[in-house]
Amino acid sequence: MAAMLASKQGAFMGRSSFAPAPKGVASRGSLQVVAGLKEVRDRIASVKNTQKITDAMKLVAAAKVRRAQEAVVNGRPFSENLVKVLYGVNQRVRQEDVDSPLCAVRPVKSVLLVVLTGDRGLCGGYNNFIIKKTEARYRELTAMGVKVNLVCVGRKGAQYFARRKQYNIVKSFSLGAAPSTKEAQGIADEIFASFIAQESDKVELVFTKFISLINSNPTIQTLLPMTPMGELCDVDGKCVDAADDEIFKLTTKGGEFAVEREKTTIETEALDPSLIFEQEPAQILDALLPLYMSSCLLRSLQEALASELAARMNAMNNASDNAKELKKGLTVQYNKQRQAKITQELAEIVGGAAATSG
């Protein structure tokens, strides 16, 4: 037994014991080695092809991330000027009670969750993180006795929640390759219709906030109602906000008018006091708030897309690195088996020559 183990070890490590082996055993061993070499060679070729695909996907995702970032930057002038106008109008109505259907606070019996996921996979845990965040918020709200409806943006989220009967999906949207104002407006119209018709008493957005190429954070943000207060409680004094909710604050602080987490540093100036509005400032505010909401949704879509592309780029980069390591290991294994095959053939030749001369 010890001699047999030593013989096998010598064959695989490229060391031959030069002991003659029976022809039948040597023949079967040769066939097994040849079959093993072909299998390893095929695996190496498969890994190489996979690496080419992951490298290409990484480059495509990197290029798209840059375009997504540029889209956010290009939209800033519009957002900045809109904030300036909103600031000026808010100055006119801040002493008055803003009577807007989008600011109406009522008892929260139904919440609409707008969930932003991707249309495709191969992006690491991006979609899974958003889905888990939504499920946790769903359980939290249902434990309070609140009815929850879903609006799914992105096929992955829609497919996941559609397979589970406890979730009620009222509408689904496709994210698309590049978010547009038309897509954001379509989502905003669905949200407004649900809120104004009192089908939903509160609307929350669940999306991934883009921080950097290697970091993103699933976030819950209250969209409606838009209130001049921080924590949102209904008329019965019941607060249903998430612990990490980012609430839209209709306020002005140091000349700023935006969602607090964005920490906007836009320099705004009050409108000229002599400026005369054709409509009441409250009416203008009612017209501007939906526009501002659409721009917020568009920016959220852009951030979600940038987060998805960054996650895909990192996932494909890790896949490429793993493919390189796997290819390296398979190459070493192939060389060892090839060396063992050559050593075995030499041993057979030497054994045959010794038997013939004997």
Swiss-Prot record:
Intracellular or extracellular location(s): Plastid, Chloroplast thylakoid membrane
Coiled-coil residue spans: none
Keywords: ATP synthesis, CF(1), Chloroplast, Disulfide bond, Hydrogen ion transport, Ion transport, Membrane, Plastid, Thylakoid, Transit peptide, Transport
Keyword Amino-acid biosynthesis: no
Transit peptide residues according to the UniProt entry: 1-35
Gene3D superfamilies the UniProt entry points to: 3.40.1380.10, ATP synthase, gamma subunit, helix hairpin domain (1.10.287.80)
Pfam family, one: ATP-synt
Keyword Heme: no
Cystine connections: C233-C239
InterPro entries the UniProt entry points to: ATP_synth_F1_ATPase_gsu, ATP_synth_F1_gsu, ATP_synth_F1_gsu_CS
Entry membrane topology: Peripheral membrane protein
Gene Ontology CC terms, in alphabetical order: chloroplast thylakoid membrane; proton-transporting ATP synthase complex
PROSITE patterns: ATPASE_GAMMA
Single Gene Ontology MF annotation: proton-transporting ATP synthase activity, rotational mechanism
CDD domains from the UniProt entry: F1-ATPase_gamma
Entry annotation: catalytic residues: C123
Purpose of the protein: F(1)F(0) ATP synthase produces ATP from ADP in the presence of a proton or sodium gradient. F-type ATPases consist of two structural domains, F(1) containing the extramembraneous catalytic core and F(0) containing the membrane proton channel, linked together by a central stalk and a peripheral stalk. During catalysis, ATP synthesis in the catalytic domain of F(1) is coupled via a rotary mechanism of the central stalk subunits to proton translocation.
Family the entry assigns: Belongs to the ATPase gamma chain family.
NCBIfam families attached to this UniProt entry: ATPsyn_F1gamma (TIGR01146), PRK05621.1-2 (NF004145)
HAMAP family attached to this UniProt entry: ATP_synth_gamma_bact
Subunit details: F-type ATPases have 2 components, F(1) - the catalytic core - and F(0) - the membrane proton channel. F(1) has five subunits: alpha(3), beta(3), gamma(1), delta(1), epsilon(1). F(0) has four main subunits: a(1), b(1), b'(1) and c(10-14). The alpha and beta chains form an alternating ring which encloses part of the gamma chain. F(1) is attached to F(0) by a central stalk formed by the gamma and epsilon chains, while a peripheral stalk is formed by the delta, b and b' chains.
Further details from the record: In plastids the F-type ATPase is also known as CF(1)CF(0).
Protein name per its UniProtKB record: ATP synthase gamma chain, chloroplastic
